UniProtKB/Swiss-Prot annotation:
This is Neuraminidase. Inhibited by the neuraminidase inhibitors zanamivir (Relenza) and oseltamivir (Tamiflu). These drugs interfere with the release of progeny virus from infected cells and are effective against all influenza strains. Resistance to neuraminidase inhibitors is quite rare. It is found in: Virion membrane; Host apical cell membrane. The chain crosses the membrane at residues 15-35. Its main location: virion. The active site is at D152 (proton donor/acceptor), Y406 (nucleophile). Its cofactor is Ca(2+). Residues 1-14 are intravirion. The gene is NA. Disulfide bonds join C93-C419, C125-C130, C177-C195, C185-C232, C234-C239, C280-C293, C282-C291, C320-C338, C423-C449. The lineage of its organism: Viruses, Riboviria, Orthornavirae, Negarnaviricota, Polyploviricotina.
Length: 470
């Protein structure tokens, strides 16, 4: 074969191969078009929302993922999951002991990292996850602006949330709303957060729903409008929230607001025999919401508000048991008071909680009767109704040689199971006023959940050494 014949043969072969490749490409394109236009598709769907794979993994807000491959390019089409309002249909699980749930070691880590100064922490869950919440002071522990963070109210505070058991940092915290008093809860569809800000005599609350401001409430007594400092609870979209405006050492005006999708359905003044209400810790079960609160005026026993979210009504009383759970407090008496404050708190108090479930009742309190140190859980059957009830079992959470602080209840209402697992957190305050060699006041968090087993015990201190900050 001469050179010219070789060239012609090679060219013809290349032309045939090229033609075959073009035909394969046209066939592939036709098949893909046919698949996308096949009659069995559901063409009535609304316009889908496209996201990348990393959003699907992190947020977990979507389902029904369809992936079609065209020429090595992934096109991901997703639909937003439809969620319903959560209903409080279950009762509490039997509580025999408490296991560790979360601990952020924020002050220890903050000795050498950009950890935010916080206080008034809590835990709240949604259908996808549980997160830590707290009121930030707008500075880090090591920052110079941490000087003076012992003060509760300023223009620099904000409700933030961050992943469970991580410390709150500039990088992992999400701002929910701006203010120095807060509550937040998920109704099954989305989250409602409430923040209060402003001067003492003219504060106001902004109610956020689905990350947008929906409603505002102005002060009614012009004396530090304030709310729960832990999560609220929702039933069938109705989310009651307890507010107080007025004196911390005398009569005040408490209201229970009923919200749905961030809008006010109704509000009512405090009813029942409780004389003073602050900083309620709430939980829900069997279509009822129970809130254990703080009587800062007179009571060393804790007031309780029981709310019917269906009828949107409530009543109040005190925990009858002589096992007193506020701080400061006197030694436990022989007989408690159901409808009156038990004296001895010297116009002071601390946020606390309880699970009031007949023989399955547990009360939380500081171990010290004079200062915010130590923490223990006590099983006190029928504490709500029996004025002579006594502890039958206990578990130490924080030793009396270690600092504690506020405490409150929370539950994961979306966890699997036939009952709700009771959970709580304890604020571990460090810095001023007790440790005045440093200029700041902050905290870490430890949280526990109930077990039906009789588990071994351990204590859970904050663990930071103040001398490392000097």
């Amino acid at each position: 074969m001469n050179p010219n014949q070789k060239i012609l043969c090679t060219s013809a072969t290349a032309l045939v191969i090229g033609t075959i490749a073009v035909l394969i490409g046209i066939t592939n394109l036709g098949l893909n078009i046919g698949l996308h236009l096949k009659p069995s598709c559901n063409c009535s769907h609304s316009q889908p929302e496209a996201t990348n794979a990393s959003q699907t993994i992190i947020n977990n807000y979507y389902n029904d993922t369809n992936i079609t491959q065209i020429s090595n390019t992934n096109i991901q089409v997703e639909e937003r999951a439809i969620r319903d309002f959560n209903n409080l249909t279950k009762g509490l699980c039997t509580i025999n002991s408490w296991h560790i749930y979360g601990k952020d070691n924020a002050v220890r880590i903050g000795e050498d990292s950009d950890v935010l100064v916080t206080r008034e922490p809590y835990v709240s869950c949604d259908p996808d996850e549980c997160r830590f919440y707290a009121l930030s002071q707008g500075t880090t522990i090591r920052g110079k602006h941490s000087n003076g963070t012992i003060h509760d109210r300023s223009q620099y505070r904000a409700l933030i949330s961050w992943p469970l058991s991580s410390p709150p940092t500039v990088y992992n915290s999400r701002v929910e709303c701006i203010g120095w008093s807060s509550t937040s809860c998920h109704d099954g569809k989305t989250r409602m957060s409430i923040c209060i800000s402003g001067p003492n005599n003219n504060a106001s609350a902004v109610i956020w729903y689905n990350r947008r401001p929906v409603t505002e409430i102005n002060t009614w007594a012009r004396n530090i409008l304030r709310t729960q400092e832990s999560e609220c609870v929702c039933h069938n979209g109705v989310c009651p929230v307890v507010f107080t405006d007025g004196s911390a050492t005398g009569p005040a005006e408490t209201r229970i607001y009923y919200f749905k999708e961030g809008k006010i359905l109704k509000w009512e003044p405090l009813a029942g025999t409780a004389k003073h209400i602050e900083e309620c810790s709430c939980y829900g079960e069997r279509a009822e919401i129970t809130c254990t609160c703080r009587d800062n005026w007179q009571g060393s026993n804790r007031p309780v508000i029981r709310i019917d979210p269906v009828a949107m009504t409530h009543t109040s009383q005190y925990i009858c048991s002589p096992v007193l759970t506020d701080n400061p407090r006197p030694n436990d008496p022989t007989v408690g008071k159901c409808n009156d404050p038990y004296p001895g708190n010297n116009n002071n108090g601390v946020k606390g909680f309880s699970y009031l479930d007949g023989v399955n009742t547990w009360l939380g309190r500081t171990i010290s009767i004079a200062s915010r140190s130590g923490y223990e859980m006590l099983k006190v059957p029928n504490a709500l109704t029996d004025d002579k009830s006594k502890p039958t079992q206990g578990q130490t959470i924080v030793l009396n040689t270690d600092w504690s602080g506020y405490s409150g209840s929370f539950m994961d209402y979306w966890a699997e199971g036939e009952c709700y697992r009771a959970c709580f957190y304890v604020e571990l305050i460090r810095g001023r006023p007790k440790e005045d060699k440093v200029w700041w006041t902050s905290n870490s968090i430890v949280s526990m959940c109930s077990s039906t087993e009789f588990l071994g015990q351990w204590d859970w201190p904050d663990g930071a050494k103040i001398e490392y900050f000097l």
